[in-house]
Amino acid sequence: MTEVTPDQVFKEMPTYFQSEKAGSTKGNVQFDLSGDNGGKWWIKIAEGKAEAGKGEVESPNLTLIADAGDYVKIATGQLDPTAAFMSGKLKIKGDMGLAMKFASLFRRP
């Protein structure tokens, strides 16, 4: 089995977005991922849609900081985001309300 990379995760995330759970949720989320395959990615949530890209987003409401491998595990359902946060594997800066809702907006592959 080939290793899943953050590029693959972010390319697919909009297809896993559950607009029915989003309601009026909106925000710009920045991801700062370190280690092998690390880099910066973003997700914009607005009007019941999500779009993703590589690089930095303007005016992030939320920044998530993690090792790239750990984030891939979170995104693919192998690591619980709350457990990752509590153990220090996931750091959160910004809108905690958006952070708490974020994981529920995307179904797991």
Regions found by a protein language model. Give the residues of each.
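Feature captures hydrophobic
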Residues: M1-P109
